[in-house]
């Protein structure tokens, strides 16, 4: 795949090299070249965001651009690539663009509080779209990615279609509850009772190699999207959520608040819905209409 809008590999946090995200060995590269486009993501690329923070992204497929943003504690690979969602979407003729949010994945993980102003993730999203020169595109995200999508829409983003996954109405309009939940998790690591939601979230944090200090900073970026702004979203919007997921409020209520919203329930809860094929299929079918 051709690199878009000058996106190149570059150094980043912790001694990132230009080879980060590339596979090693000629035999492996030959194998990748023989795979269908829809199963072979590009190497990780980087750009400097509005404040100079290096932000990583990957792409999969060719065609109409769709930007998909992952959830908190996660990254593009875990949320979109590992369980085949990006491949399903790319197979429908889409160029799936998947950033790692700041403090996540291969993006920079600054510890300076100044790196986490209100709506920083929103500004990163706008910066990525500008960097890639996108003018006709679709936009969506899972959980924190869906919240970031709502903030981008409230601050001028103009996608054709919108996806809110793992998200309910209260998760957009009342962010303080979730911020408090995650602040408790990150401030009491190693102390949560086994089997509780807090313990499960900490276990997920460990699997993704999350940086607790940087992730605490992310909580300072949260901003509510007023209900009036939600109701002003005029694009066709898919609200796709696990049938057992109420972590971010009611998904049916969110769909009802959107002028052109539709709700699709998939199997699972907030954590488990991501591993189910129905999530990617619902998004692919919606975008391909």
Feature-to-residue mapping (PLM):
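Conserved HGGG/HGGXW glycine-rich cap/lid loop of the alpha/beta-hydrolase fold
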Residues: 50-108
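Active-site loop/oxyanion-hole signature of alpha/beta-hydrolase fold enzymes
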Residues: 88-91, 98-137
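Short beta-strand immediately N-terminal to the catalytic nucleophile in serine-hydrolase-like folds
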Residues: 139-141, 165
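Flexible "cap/lid" loop of the alpha/beta hydrolase fold
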Residues: 147-190
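Hydrophobic, aromatic-rich cap/lid helix
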Residues: 202-226
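Short beta-strand/loop motif that positions the catalytic acidic residue
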Residues: 233, 239-241
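Conserved loop-alpha-helix segment in the C-terminal half of the alpha/beta-hydrolase fold
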Residues: 241-269
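Catalytic histidine-centered segment of alpha/beta-hydrolase-like enzymes
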Residues: 269-280
